[in-house]
Amino acid sequence: MPKHTSRPTTTISTEPLVCNLCGPNAYPGKHCPSCLAYQKAHYYRGYGVDSPGSADFFCVADSPHSIIISRQTDEHVGWCFDIEKSVRQIFDELRRVQRYAPYYGRYTYATRCTNDWLVKPSGKMIQNCSGLLMEELVRIAKPDKPILVFAMGGEVLKAFKLKVQKYGSVQGKLLETEIAGRKVLIYPSLSKRQLATKTGYYDVLRAHMNNFLDIVWQLNHNMVVDPHITIEELTGDYRFPSTLKEVDELVDDILAYALPGKDPRTHAISLDTETNTLFAHRAQLKVLSLTVAWDKGKAASIPIEHPDTPWSLEDVRPALKRLFLSSKPKVFHNGKFDLKILARKGFTVENVRWDTMCAEHLLYEDKKKFYGLKEIVAAYFPKYAGYEDKIHDILHHTERQLDEMEKKQAKEETVPKPKESKAKKKLRRDKGYSDIALETLNKYGAIDADLTRQLAMRQLQMFEDEDRTLRKARQQLSIKPQFRAIAAPGTSDPQPLMTLMKGRVIPLTKILADMELTGIRVDREYAEDLSIKMGTTMLNARIAINQMVPKALNEEFNPSSPQQLRSILFGTGYTNPETGEQVCYKGKEQEIGVEYTSTHLESTNAKLLRSLVTQRGCALSRQILLYRAMEKAKNTFIANTLALSEEDGRLHTNFHITGTATGRLSSSDENMQNIPEKISVKVNIRGKEEDVVHNIKKVFSVTDPENQLFVNADAKAAEVRIYAAYSRDKNLIRALIDGMDPHSYFASMIYQRSNLLADVPPDQHKATLELIGIDDYHAWTYEDFQNSKVFLGDKRKGIVGTDPKYGSQLEKLRKNIKRVVFGILYGATPNKISSIVGITEEQSRVIIATLDRMFPTIKEYVTHTKQQVQTLGVVETYFGRRRRLYVRNLPFNLRNKAERQGVNFKIQSTSSEIVLGVLCAIDEVLRRDLGGQLLLTVHDSVCFEIPKKYGAQAVDLIEDYGVKRVGKLCPWLPVPFKWDVTAGPSYGEQTALDGTGTKEVVEDPDAFIEQEIKDELADAG
């Protein structure tokens, strides 16, 4: 073992100060004057050990650019920005482990100069500075060992002249190169830009650092560290049957295999399928092979429909069926995909017990893009990192050939083809592993199965370890009386993660697989017609917009162009179509809360446009919002839906269990969680202004329109009901039990003049009422908010309102309250709420202050949850789902964000858990007793189709399983979990079922932006 008699020098002052702003050039010769940063940016020195031959390792970031707010004041001291401090802190914590304690590092950059304007180093800068970096590494690294580099960004690899397809594809893999005749081992990890976006990425960073320090330890113990482990070494004990007899013998051996005296869970087998397509519903689907593992290092691959397979699917069906129906516990990684694939081929898999992708999400809920098997393997089993490179190189080569061929064809075409939708291109290139030779596919597929099983065994232990560690932390914290409430667990279940896996994740996986495979019928004729009509409406809308735009523009105005819109809103102004006056917001940027881009230009995003509509009644902004919504709906959603449903007339959306940190589902192909609502646009047609309504949800209908109903059960104000459970607010609980609409209730309480003005000096009463939009004539009662349509009327139906102006203001104020309440419950800050909702900060302040006074439990809940984040680092729902927010190692801005995310998490996660529980509960009853089929789940709703004769029973079904059953399973819920149940021939044509008949569903004309606002508030939290 190496001896360390003294601590290396850690001063940062011995490196000479070379800064072309403050002294001589950093780089001798001509390089600095040719650089973009020359005399525009400061030079930053490295940090850590800097004596010659003293560094055991180097941590290299791309540049000193500060991604987020920093309290750094010295213009030349590097690695002192907030994210960089967090990185150093994690390294220091890991080095407290005895085996890593003797090793010291140097923290430096691939490029040394930066400024606010210089977000990303250019290729020229990297080239110029690489000589400085190489000299630093050779000078400070220990002379008798390879140079070890922990890389934080793709620019670092460029400095070493290493070319990779994508930086993300090599993260967690050990790379090798050479400088000045010395071997260099590089471990690429997350960049500072990535670390600035998600708190969960610090878990990935920590795992990478741990692996890297292990390599440091191995090298200092003269152990061989080889980044190029061979596939033959990994697959030495694998089996690859070549006859049907060998297939039968393999299955017999797997079923008979057991580990005497060990936990029965270790008898599990892992399964994985390799296919020629990513879409299970496609006619071209072939299961190229099935891979299985039954112990560490024991795996096999059974060819099935690969072109080189010596038998047919039917030949091996009996053997595979025995395997799938056996009592052996089954393990998958992203099992939803494999279950769909096998179901298409007529197989059912019994005793599914574990999904390693979902288990990883239960352990680390916020590391999006790092739930793939190869990413997890790189973190847990570094010797396997990069095992799939050969297959990915083949696939990349095929993609590159297709790109070149398409470019060549495009040049030869005389008439350009219309732009292809993203989905259409994805389908056209969907070949899966069909180009991979069987021998290669067998080996790599079997490694997948082997690693999946190894990972499952490790995760089982991690579940137990975390439960034990958290229990101990809570016990220690609860010793102090003031921390007992904070230390209390969310659930009494001693093993909540295991319960979630067995009781929620696995059942949900099976049901979602069935829903995805079934798909939802697309009325393609209607969708195509709608696309044409929307194109016409968009053209007319552009004409209407152009009439507001100054004629002096030298080019046609494009509503999607931020640059042109900015020049009008904050430059020339636009013409109000009603008054004819010129409107411009230049000089009012601060007043309306304008945000700025990274290039210091006024942002023209949706938040600003909504603010202008709400605060200023901006006609141009409203038309732009509508136009952009239509453009997105037509060119993205409808175009992709038509492409994805072309083969069988159905959309087979892909639900993602690991898509959000809260446990809510996300989806893709196509994103049904973001399905546009009805869009109503006023356009001038032949000199006459008309309302044109585009019903996008109508695209989705039942399988048999003559005999079936499309039912949508939507949880009513789910988040507010969950808040009532966590806050125990007596007034809110009473209102919900009495069946009151929570948003009208909040509005009536807040906008009562006596409540609103309680803490306002008398001389400011009038100004406050004017600020909020309340007069002293109307009542502003709960009944009035509920009956706003009576006051407002309906021009389209010829119904004259009793007080249209009052009705309009009631609707506006109710929406504002609804949005503000959601923002608070989601943990958004007041200024974020103001900018997203589209009200002034002053209005937001008054409303929030009144809410805090009327409902003090809101503030108490928020404060309590933030204290849990600060002291325990974990918040837990009633179901035991956890959000890990260890703020100690986070930069300042992410620390604040983590506290808000804790507030957001409890509400959203608990609500989602109940909705998904109802989805799972009704599945079997729906199919068995009502002849129905689950189709979708969107946010807090569940959609299914049933025969028309059972329409009335849909309400009973939801009452039994969505209200009564939820009440029994959730005794902590003090209010009924109510639902709005609607039905109709399609998703977009719905009437409310009340048990005795139907009543019209009242449509919100601004519904298309309501969900957008809600999503933004959730993201802000």
Task: Indicate where each model-derived feature is located.
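A polyanion-binding, active-site-adjacent surface
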Residues: P2-H221
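Conserved "right-hand" nucleotidyltransferase catalytic core of DNA-directed polymerases
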Residues: Q218-H306, E350, A379-F381, Y387-E689, ...
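Short, conserved secondary-structure transition motifs
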Residues: E360-K368, P559-S560, R566-F570, I750, ...
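Short amphipathic alpha-helices in soluble, non-transmembrane regions
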Residues: V955-V963
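Conserved catalytic core of nucleic-acid polymerases
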Residues: K417, K425-S434, L508-L517, T614, ...
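Conserved RNase H-like, two-metal-ion catalytic cores of nucleic-acid enzymes
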Residues: G48-G53, F57-F58, S66-S70, E75-Q98, ...
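Short active-site oxyanion
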Residues: K145-L148, F324-K330, N554-E555, N707-V711
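Metal-dependent phosphoesterase core characteristic of DEDDh/y 3'-5' exonuclease domains
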Residues: V87-R95, K161-L174, R182, I186, ...
